[in-house]
């Protein structure tokens, strides 16, 4: 995937997480409880486009943050 797109998606996730009032630790914990092997550090890397997202992580992030895929993948 294009690095600029990954950075934009990461920024979207960070913005949506902050809007929900969640910390990176909280999001990582919720993802772990949902079955994803992820740490706070990995969440931080996702948010700056330094780590790829796996499909199961995307699905859970959408559910945890209560947002749409359009909000996560918007590149405008």
Regions found by a protein language model. Name each.
Residues 13, 24, 40, 55-58:
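Helix-turn-helix DNA-binding elements, focusing on the entry/boundary residues of the two helices
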Residues 32-52:
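Recognition helix of helix-turn-helix/homeodomain-like DNA-binding domains
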Residues 50, 54-71:
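DNA major-groove recognition helix of helix-turn-helix/homeodomain DNA-binding modules
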Residues 13, 27-28, 43-46, 72:
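Conserved hydrophobic/aromatic packing and binding residues within compact polymer-binding modules
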Residues 11-32:
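Short basic helix-loop element that most often maps to the first helix and adjoining turn
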Residues 1-8, 74-75:
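A detector for short, charged/polar N-terminal pre-domain segments
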């Amino acid at each position: 995937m294009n690095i600029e797109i990954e950075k934009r998606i990461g920024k979207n996730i960070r913005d949506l997480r902050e809007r929900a009032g969640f910390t990176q630790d909280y999001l990582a914990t919720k993802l772990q409880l949902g079955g994803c092997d992820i740490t706070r550090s990995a969440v931080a890397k996702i948010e700056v486009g330094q780590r790829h997202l796996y499909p199961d992580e995307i699905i859970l992030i959408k559910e945890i943050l209560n947002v749409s895929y359009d909000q996560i993948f918007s590149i405008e």
